[in-house]
Amino acid sequence: MTRPIVIAIDGPAASGKGTLARRLAAAFNLPYLDTGLLYRAVARRVLDRGGDPADPAASEEQARSLSRLDLERGDLRTPEVDRAASAVASIKPVRAALLDFQRRFADASGAVLDGRDIGTIVFPEADVKLFVTASLDVRAKRRHLERLAHGIDPGFDSVRAELAARDEADRTRAAAPLVQAKDALLLDTSQMDANHAFTAAADLVNKVLARG
């Protein structure tokens, strides 16, 4: 395969897809883009300006003004931004504004991208598509540990409820709902640590690429 390789990784929040995508990008020498960070950055920009993330006009304006520097902020993974990003991601004009950003990122040298609609909307022609998931309880435990590592303890039950609400919003939104692409390979990481998940994913990628 001589053209740039695109690996699309989709799945619900806290499924391990981000960690997996970063490791695959390093292993296959490809750029990496966490597309969920785009929506977080847009949400952060709206909040900073005192706007409502659910306001289509305000969120679209910030989506069209987004730069790569916005993705480097250290305050994009707070509970407030989590909730705001979910609202932003449901707005069709915002998703349209960010679509070109994502495609241009991978055009020149390929990429590993993770999100919720990479294999279905952003890169339906991706060379490899993975759908990474895990049980709600496992994902809630992972997210809770992440919060604790950042000095935040909202409680496990609160995190679990937050993820369940995010899952429902992702699955039912009109704009690019979270679904497994028909040709995506399923990887359930419920019983896997990060190393096991990476090994399994890398094997899947190599098998697909070997078929040409």
Swiss-Prot record:
Q: Which domain of life is it from?
A: Bacteria
Enzyme Commission number, as recorded: 2.7.4.25
Intracellular or extracellular location(s): Cytoplasm
Q: Gene3D superfamilies recorded for this chain? A: P-loop containing nucleotide triphosphate hydrolases
Q: Can you supply a Gene Ontology BP term from the record?
A: pyrimidine nucleotide metabolic process
List the catalytic activities from the record.
Answer: CMP + ATP = CDP + ADP; dCMP + ATP = dCDP + ADP
User: What's a Pfam family this protein contains?
Assistant: Cytidylate_kin
The main place the protein resides is: cytoplasm
Q: Name one GO cellular component term.
A: cytoplasm
The name this protein goes by in its record: Cytidylate kinase
Taxonomic lineage from the root: Bacteria, Pseudomonadati, Pseudomonadota, Alphaproteobacteria, Acetobacterales
